[in-house]
From Swiss-Prot:
It comes from Oceanobacillus iheyensis (strain DSM 14371 / CIP 107618 / JCM 11309 / KCTC 3954 / HTE831). Belongs to the class I-like SAM-binding methyltransferase superfamily. rRNA adenine N(6)-methyltransferase family. RsmA subfamily. It comes from the Bacteria. This is Ribosomal RNA small subunit methyltransferase A. Specifically dimethylates two adjacent adenosines (A1518 and A1519) in the loop of a conserved hairpin near the 3'-end of 16S rRNA in the 30S particle. May play a critical role in biogenesis of 30S subunits. One of its GO terms (molecular function) is 16S rRNA (adenine(1518)-N(6)/adenine(1519)-N(6))-dimethyltransferase activity. It is an enzyme of class 2 (transferase). InterPro entries: KsgA/Erm, rRNA_Ade_diMease-like_C, rRNA_Ade_Mease_Trfase_CS, rRNA_Ade_methylase_Trfase_N, rRNA_adenine_dimethylase, SAM-dependent_MTases_sf. It catalyses: adenosine(1518)/adenosine(1519) in 16S rRNA + 4 S-adenosyl-L-methionine = N(6)-dimethyladenosine(1518)/N(6)-dimethyladenosine(1519) in 16S rRNA + 4 S-adenosyl-L-homocysteine + 4 H(+). The lineage of its organism: Bacteria, Bacillati, Bacillota, Bacilli, Bacillales. The keyword rRNA processing applies. The keyword Transferase applies. It is found in: Cytoplasm. Pfam families: RrnaAD. Keywords: Cytoplasm, Methyltransferase, RNA-binding, rRNA processing, S-adenosyl-L-methionine, Transferase.
Length: 294
């Protein structure tokens, strides 16, 4: 198929939207990509080949789905907007390796879908242009569920991509960085200007790649408690670790006790949460956890 016939061009996208009298729903964060080269970059970074399978979230009118269908073995796309189903049937009609599921990804049993649609042991990648308003819940569900997928390569708001891939002592580093990086290795592979979308959003985007870890990079006694400690440490970014944790443990440990536990963990209480590595947070959480039942 020649490039000008691809869905992801301004003229073809306008034709499809006009044919179906489609209007964008702001509540669903619908912004369609109209630059084929950006899509092909996503496919390349995602490592999609004819041996791999792909899961897409929010296919829209099928621009990314089409590129996945061309390059992957099998594609399953989750679409929540019923109005798009007949459009997808039309635009993707020639691709026999695409299945569209009308379901909210947050309610889907993705592991079951993988088992039912893909070959046993096949390498699976999640590839998506995610709606900005629900990016974090979707990604956190997918990585916390520890799906049998190799990576997630997603187009998201640049600011969120920076936060998810943030490193200690940077403005973007916080509890979200640590949550994402506990389950995956995160890196921004490409920045994408807002001009390549229809309608044009107010912000620029980035392509973020999350490579799933087989094991977390740190050992923690209790995962929930570990993430509670992290959240508490960033509750007020300008405050010290000691002050934030004193507030968190109010009625349980006084300031003196918190100082003592932090010393035992080998971390100075005068530091701020943004300066701690994941290893240091694990040490702090594991040390405090020992005192939970004392």
């Amino acid at each position: 198929m020649t490039t000008n016939k691809y869905i992801a061009t301004p003229s073809r996208t306008k034709d499809i939207l006009g044919k179906y009298h489609f209007t964008f729903k702001k509540s669903l964060g619908q912004n369609f990509l109209v630059d084929v080269s950006v899509l092909q970059n996503i496919i390349r970074h995602a490592g999609i080949t004819k041996d791999t399978a792909a899961i897409e979230i929010g296919p829209g009118i099928g621009a990314l789905t089409e590129q996945l269908a061309i390059h992957a073995d099998q594609v399953v796309a989750f679409e929540i907007d019923q109005r798009l189903l007949p459009i997808l049937q039309d635009t993707l009609g020639e691709y026999s390796n695409v299945s569209v599921i009308h379901q909210d990804i947050l309610k889907a049993d993705v592991t079951k879908v993988i088992d039912e649609h893909f070959k046993e042991g096949q390498e699976v990648h999640v590839v998506a242009n995610l709606p900005y308003y629900i990016t974090t819940p979707i990604l956190m569900k997918l990585i916390r569920d520890r799906l049998p997928v190799t990576s997630l390569t997603v187009m998201i708001q640049k600011e969120v991509a920076d936060r998810m891939s943030g490193e200690p002592n940077s403005k973007s580093y916080g509890s979200l960085s640590l949550a994402v990086q506990y389950y995956s290795e995160a890196k921004v592979v490409m920045n994408v200007p807002k001009q390549v979308f229809m309608p044009q959003p107010n912000v620029d985007s980035s392509i973020l790649q999350l490579t799933m870890r087989k094991q977390p990079p740190v050992e923690v006694t209790d995962e929930d408690f570990f993430f509670e400690i992290i959240q508490a440490s960033f509750a007020q970014r300008r405050k010290t670790l000691k002050n934030n944790l004193t507030r968190f443990f109010k009625g349980v440990h006084d300031k003196e006790k918190i100082d003592h536990i932090l010393q035992e963990a080998g971390v100075e209480g005068i530091r701020r949460g943004e300066s701690l590595t994941m290893e240091e947070f694990a040490q702090v959480a594991n040390t405090f956890y020992q005192y939970q039942s004392k």
